[in-house]
From Swiss-Prot:
The modification Phosphotyrosine is found at Y641, Y642, Y718, Y754. Autophosphorylated. Binding of FGF family members together with heparan sulfate proteoglycan or heparin promotes receptor dimerization and autophosphorylation on tyrosine residues. Autophosphorylation occurs in trans between the two FGFR molecules present in the dimer. The active site is at D611 (proton acceptor). Its main location: membrane. It catalyses: L-tyrosyl-[protein] + ATP = O-phospho-L-tyrosyl-[protein] + ADP + H(+). It comes from Gallus gallus. Disulfide bonds join C61-C107, C170-C222, C269-C333. Keywords: Apoptosis, ATP-binding, Cell membrane, Disulfide bond, Glycoprotein, Immunoglobulin domain, Kinase, Membrane, Nucleotide-binding, Phosphoprotein, Receptor, Repeat, Signal, Transferase, Transmembrane, Transmembrane helix, Tyrosine-protein kinase. SUPFAM superfamilies: Immunoglobulin, Protein kinase-like (PK-like). This is Fibroblast growth factor receptor 3. The lineage of its organism: Eukaryota, Metazoa, Chordata, Craniata, Vertebrata. Present in an inactive conformation in the absence of bound ligand. Ligand binding leads to dimerization and activation by autophosphorylation on tyrosine residues. Glycans are attached at N83, N96, N118, N219, N256, N288, N309, N322. Residues 390-806 are cytoplasmic.
Length: 806
């Protein structure tokens, strides 16, 4: 191809190693604008050359004189030789090209500003196949590009904390294969436009920005085009700054203490701080008979401060040995960082030994009087209640009738659940029918065989074909035992398989029976899925109610992961015992993927779990994850949320804020719990929010705190966790999206990528219980702090004559 400018001729040669890229002619409108920006020439059009990533580019400028040497420019900037770029007298050669090599190239004589040639180079992962001459040979499916995964592009607004990684995707297809480039706020976006650079993964149609900052906010548009046209899609990015904060001190610590003279005293102070805190213990003193200075600040002495060999954990405890009366007074824990200071105070009261004994004696007398008085009042109250009950008690026949009426209000009807049932029973048939009651009074049903359920031929199993075995565990209203069942597999009626059998305890109530029946019916209607515990059958006739479900030999996921922690680490249960099997990173991703699939199925059946956690996921012999415990599950076919009305035990550390504070349960609140379950998986069964008391957790969640990334978790997976923990429920991903994301991660993960277990898991140790345990500050914090509260703090202290004034 030749183009003439006056008497000068330019020859452009383009060659690629391994494959010859195609050249496509662009219109004068687009190319001419770029030429005018960088070049002083009268070019009528630009020639665009398309190369594949990794190819070699060769551009040549020919002049009438063979002795003329030329300079080369890219986007108006001179090109210097490098290990990839070779410059000859008239030749420019670039090897192993990448997307960053795309741009406008020009050549000029060494002693002239006259442009001899210019070329537009675009580098893609998949170069276009064919020249304009080949258009007639293209298939009938040619046309404008199209989106291949529009469902992955529905979330247009992305709000992330600063320092996170952001990934935008625009999966597309077309014939000829389209190319993609990106705009920010309407202008072309390249790596040099951002301090941290960008990653353009053309095969995945994605733009990746690591460690985002507030200046990255804006609208990002992907433009996908081929010669038939283009399509575009815009994402909006909002980067949230992490607010710096002064330390947070746990409420109630240090606590007031009263001791006898000569005792030893410990004051505790729990500090939470994003930045490294500086902790001091102060004692309030008097100077010239006054506790406060002229400016109103208290006089204090420093009892304990950071030293060369002290740790934050040591500084959180103040020890006083063999206290005297002079030690009585006010003590303050002062914690500060680069942002500010926070403090909590407590009083120490020191009593003489005899006074404390007198107090104990007088206290014993008062306690005795109080206990006797309380006992007398309770006795009289019980006596009155018994008399009233006997006065109102009818004859035996009337009593039986009344009891039957009371319990007959209990039977459930299938019409109460709006899910479509596959059961063969009539929709109005009561699930429980009363036949007779024992003579025992009260609502306790010690002999549950006195309640009959109509048989369901599809699920009924004769008791003679069931052999009960060892207990497996106990639930809220019943127990689970292992059993051998014959006839579960209809194709092999004589084959025995191992099952788990749910049954009521001996002291079960009618409400307990209602819950078990409801769970059985729910499992019937939800149907079967590989990643949930499925119903296998039931024994409802001639005896207690038995519900047969799948048996998972490896127990729950939490214990499964903990049993496979490596030996020799301080977080391993038994350092002498080798783990049962070594887990790879892909094994952990597979666990998460399977649970997500099970939850996707439950969500499709309009079922909200409300108690999703690793302890409620069971593992089979073949390492298949199965979601269990539908006891808290509820049908929400007609409504999209469920408000809990009872005050039963709730798994607060797995609960979404809207469920925790407003008792509103949706599929999005299950997604939050799934994020916590992901954290459990990648800490090999760690306890969420280790060392954080429940009361403190409420406050921290309201302030936007989230758990930090586990040591063996990739940044992409941690981003999935953080998306699950979005404060706005509607901004969390759906389980369908989670399945797709985890499937992608699973596909890209190596099968032999073993965990880097050289990093200790101190903050995920089993010692970190879910109750009121301690937590160190600084690097041991499990929180990523977003927004934090204002707290009163002491002014910065200054030395004053050997006494610290604050």
């Amino acid at each position: 191809m030749r183009a003439a400018w006056g008497s000068v001729w330019c020859l452009c040669l383009a060659a690629a190693v391994g494959a010859l890229p195609a050249a496509r002619r662009r219109g004068a409108e687009r190319s001419g604008g770029q030429a005018a920006e960088y070049l002083r020439s009268e070019t009528a059009f630009l020639e665009e050359l398309v190369f594949g990533s990794g190819d070699t580019i060769e551009l040549s400028c020919n002049t009438q004189s063979s002795s003329v040497s030329v300079f080369w420019f890219k986007d108006g900037i001179g090109i210097a030789p490098s290990n990839r770029t070779h410059i000859g007298q008239k030749l420019l050669k670039i090897i192993n090209v990448s997307y960053d090599d795309s741009g406008l190239y020009s050549c000029k004589p060494r002693h002239s500003n006259e442009v001899l040639g210019n070329f537009t180079v675009r580098v893609t992962d998949s170069p276009s196949s064919g020249d304009d001459e080949d258009d007639d040979d293209e298939s009938e499916d040619t046309g404008v590009p199209f989106w291949t995964r529009p469902d992955k592009m529905e979330k247009k607004l992305l709000a992330v904390p600063a320092a996170n990684t952001v990934r935008f995707r625009c999966p597309a297809g077309g014939n000829p294969t389209p190319t993609i480039y990106w705009l920010k706020n309407g202008k072309e976006f390249k790596g040099e436009h951002r301090i941290g650079g960008i990653k353009l993964r053309h095969q995945q149609w994605s733009l990746v920005m690591e460690s985002v900052v507030p200046s990255d906010r804006g609208n990002y548009t992907c433009v996908v085009e081929n010669k038939y046209g283009n399509i575009r899609h815009t994402y909006q990015l909002d980067v949230l700054e992490r607010s710096p904060h002064r330390p947070i001190l746990q409420a109630g610590l240090p606590a007031n203490q009263t001791v006898v003279v000569g005792s030893n005293v410990e004051f505790h102070c729990k500090v939470y701080s994003d930045a490294q805190p500086h902790i001091q213990w102060l004692k309030h003193v008097e100077v010239n008979g006054s506790k406060y200075g002229p400016d109103g600040t208290p006089y204090v002495t420093v009892l304990k401060t950071a030293g060369v060999n002290t740790t934050d954990k040591e500084l959180e405890i103040l020890y006083l040995r063999n206290v005297t009366f002079e030690d009585a007074g006010e003590y303050t824990c002062l914690a500060g960082n680069s942002i500010g200071f926070s403090h909590h105070s407590a009083w120490l009261t020191v009593l003489p030994a005899e006074e404390l004994m007198e107090m104990d004696d007088s206290g014993s007398v008062y306690a005795g009087i109080l206990s006797y008085g309380t006992g007398l009042v309770l006795f009289i109250l019980v006596l009155v209640i018994v008399i009233i009950c006997r006065m109102k008690m009818p004859n035996k026949k009337a009593m039986n009738t009344t009891t039957v009426q009371k319990v007959s209000k209990f039977p459930l009807k299938r019409q109460q659940v709006s899910l479509e049932s596959n059961s063969s029973m009539n929709s109005n048939t009561p699930l429980v029918r009363i036949t007779r009651l024992s003579s025992s009074d009260g609502p306790m049903l010690a002999n549950v065989s006195e309640l009959e359920l109509p048989p369901d031929p599809k699920w009924e199993l004769a008791r003679s074909r069931l052999t009960l075995g060892k207990p497996l565990g106990e639930g809220c209203f019943g127990q689970v035992v292992m059993a051998e069942a014959i006839g579960i597999d209809k194709d092999k009626p004589n084959k025995a398989i191992t099952v788990a059998v749910k049954m009521l305890k001996d002291d079960a109530t009618d409400k307990d029976l209602s819950d078990l029946v409801s769970e059985m019916e729910m499992m019937k209607m939800i149907g079967k899925h590989k990643n949930i515990i499925n119903l296998l059958g039931a024994c409802t006739q001639d005896g207690p109610l038995y519900v047969l479900v799948e048996y998972a030999s490896k127990g729950n996921l939490r214990e499964y992961l903990r049993a496979r922690r490596p030996p020799g680490m301080d977080y391993s249960f038994d350092t002498c015992k080798l783990p049962e099997e070594q887990l790879t990173f892909k094994d952990l991703v597979s666990c998460a993927y399977q649970v997500a699939r099970g939850m996707e199925y439950l969500a499709s059946q309009k079922c909200i779990h409300r108690d999703l956690a690793a302890r409620n996921v069971l593992v089979t012999e073949d390492n298949v994850m199965k979601i269990a415990d539908f006891g808290l599950a509820r049908d929400v076919h007609n409504i999209d949320y469920y408000k809990k009305t009872t005050n039963g035990r709730l798994p607060v550390k797995w609960m979404a804020p809207e469920a925790l504070f407003d008792r509103v349960y949706t599929h999005q609140s299950d997604v939050w719990s799934f994020g916590v379950l992901l954290w459990e998986i990648f800490t090999l069964g760690g306890s969420p929010y280790p060392g954080i008391p429940v009361e403190e957790l409420f406050k921290l969640l309201k302030e936007g705190h989230r758990m930090d990334k586990p040591a063996n978790c990739t940044h992409d997976l941690y981003m999935i966790m953080r998306e699950c923990w979005h404060a706005v429920p509607s901004q969390r991903p759906t389980f369908k999206q989670l399945v797709e994301d985890l499937d992608r991660v699973l596909t890209m993960t190596s099968t032999d990528e073993y965990l880097d277990l050289s990093v200790p898991f101190e903050q995920y140790s089993p010692a970190g219980q879910d109750t009121h345990s301690t937590c160190s500050s600084g690097d041991d914090s499990v929180f990523a702090h977003d927004l934090l509260p204002d707290e009163p703090c002491l002014p910065k202290h200054v030395p004053c004559n050997g006494v610290i004034r604050t």
